[in-house]
Swiss-Prot record:
GO terms for cellular component: cytoplasm. The active site is at residues 82, 207, 235. It comes from Klebsiella pneumoniae (strain 342). The physiological role of BioH is to remove the methyl group introduced by BioC when the pimeloyl moiety is complete. It allows to synthesize pimeloyl-ACP via the fatty acid synthetic pathway through the hydrolysis of the ester bonds of pimeloyl-ACP esters. InterPro entries: AB_hydrolase_1, AB_hydrolase_fold, BioH, Carboxylesterase_BioH. It is an enzyme of class 3 (hydrolase). GO terms for molecular function: pimelyl-[acyl-carrier protein] methyl ester esterase activity. Pathway: Cofactor biosynthesis; biotin biosynthesis. This is Pimeloyl-[acyl-carrier protein] methyl ester esterase. The gene is bioH. The lineage of its organism: Bacteria, Pseudomonadati, Pseudomonadota, Gammaproteobacteria, Enterobacterales.
Length: 257
């Protein structure tokens, strides 16, 4: 099986693995790697099937987490954005002894709306899957525009994300479809109750994909975790507010000693 693309930079004594979201790749972290590299040893990863980690089709969440773990350092802080948040959470559930802390960014344990749970309407996710088969580049671009809508720098932020996608090979339609299937079906709400490691959750108030209404619901469900809401950010707070985004990560590093 192909190795996944993995780059290690920085000289901090704390290892930080960064997992990107659906349709993207590790280039999305370019706006924060300079700030973080002097504090952490950063592990930048293209998830299987994305960016430079070609040769993978659709995978289950468990298989994706296992594949990433195989190349990971023995111990690290794991940070996952959006779909990457589910992968990082799955890693923490499978091997908590290898995770010093879990950080999820604009991520939900259950992306699909159901009953009284706020999220993306299942028919919207199914629509994206349908559109992928028709014109997947345009579908990915629409998804990127949705991620930055509402922020003062929306156009510029969408450009940064689009640049990250277009600078590398496009993911295969199978990998993209597999990622949407994970977003549509996975529900880790109960599985993450009582997670035995520090857990930090970061959100954007203007996020159109992960509604801020889930924040108090998860505060109640996971009382040991900590949540931070960036007031003027949407789905990609590290792109729109890089300096503010890095602050809680540096505080977490201090807390871990």
């Amino acid at each position: 099986m192909n190795d996944i693309w993995w780059q290690t930079i920085g000289e901090g004594d704390c290892h930080l693995v960064l997992l990107h979201g659906w349709g993207l790749n590790a280039q999305v972290w370019d706006c924060i790697t300079p700030q973080l590299a002097s504090h952490f040893t950063l592990h930048l990863v293209d998830l299987p099937g994305y960016g430079r980690s070609g040769g993978y089709g659709a995978m289950s969440l468990e298989a994706m987490a296992q594949r990433v773990l195989e190349q990971a350092p023995p111990q690290a802080v794991w940070l996952g954005w959006s779909l990457g948040g589910l992968v990082a959470s799955q890693v923490a559930m499978m091997h908590p002894e290898r995770v010093q802390a879990l950080v999820t960014v604009a991520s939900s344990p259950c992306f699909a709306a159901c009953d009284d749970w706020p999220g993306i309407k299942p028919e919207v996710l199914a629509g994206f899957q349908q559109q992928l088969s028709d014109d997947f580049q345009r579908t990915v671009e629409r998804f990127l525009a949705l991620q930055t809508m509402g922020t003062e720098s929306a156009r510029q932020d969408a450009r940064a994300l689009k640049q990250a996608v277009l600078s590398l090979p496009m993911p295969s339609a199978e990998a993209l479809n597999g990622g949407l299937e994970i977003l549509r079906t996975v529900d880790l709400r109960q599985a993450l109750v009582g997670l035995p490691i520090p857990f930090l959750r970061l959100y954007g108030r203007l996020d159109g994909l992960v509604p801020r209404k889930i924040v108090p619901l998860l505060d109640e469900l996971w009382p040991e975790s900590e949540s931070i809401l960036f007031d003027k950010a949407a789905h990609a707070p590290f792109v729109s507010h890089p300096a503010a985004f890095c602050e809680p990560l540096l505080a977490l590093k201090t807390q871990l000693g």
